[in-house]
Amino acid sequence: MPKEFEAKFLNIDITSIKNKLRENGATKVHDPLKFYRLIFKRCEEAGDKPGFVRIRDEGKKITMTTKIFNDKKFPEEHEVTINESFEKGCEFLKAIGIQEKSYQETMREKWSHPLAHEITFDIVPGLPIYMEIDCTSEANLNKLVALLDLDKSNMKYGSFDKTYTKYYDIPSDNIIHKTPSLTFKDVGTQIKPNKNVSLFREITKLNKLIDERKMDTYYKKYKTLIYDKFLSETPGSESKTKSKNKRTRRHKKGRRNATHRRKSGI
């Protein structure tokens, strides 16, 4: 059965990575396109393996996909392109009794490379831009990661619900089962971050530019407000910094107490 050998890279310097892609033979397939998708639960008869069914409008085509997570890193995937509209695809799944879960919007810029099925830069409501590399084998994935000199500490697997957990400590279950809609216009009221609140606030402001189709302005402000200001450290660095500061304060307090004891003759 087909597997999807895919990895996400967070905290990316978009300009630098695109330059490396060009230097290593990659070409841009299309500029950012807005994707719309409706997520459905898999049939109960399919068993208890986690997964979903998706209808997605990719701007130039409509796809119907199912992903089955037998493997923590690389899910099993089956996908077909349908000739009917997005709405007709959704009607078909509802007609055969598959339950609708959520509606989601994303923006995607696609690149191609001989080692990859596709390389994408994804903009998801409320999240910093990340890159996804999708290959036909794990060996090709590792080769491309090395070729582009990507930071493996920022390499993540799985669907984007886990990315919300990484940046904002929002449980995956909240995104998968308790968020019926994720849109650029309203994400600020659709989910609530538990950390990195300032980052989330700035991202949601920028997301409104996407909804208004002001992509040039979005990218300029993203570089200044998000990458330079917030993403110099890995997701979760906020808590690491607090921990480091706490250790520093304990160390200084210990030194002061030792000095006091020496002066007091203790």
Protein language model annotation of sequence segments:
Residues 1, 18, 61, 128-130, ...:
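Long, contiguous binding/interaction regions
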Residues 1-116, 153-230, 247-256:
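N-terminal strand-loop-strand beta-hairpin
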Residues 37-38, 68-69, 86, 120-123, ...:
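Generic hydrophobic/packing signal
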Residues 72-74, 137, 261-262:
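Intrinsic-disorder/low-complexity, polar/charged segments
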Residues 96, 102-146:
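Conserved, surface-exposed functional patches that form binding/active-site neighborhoods
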Residues 234-265:
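Arg/Lys-rich, intrinsically disordered low-complexity tails that mediate electrostatic binding
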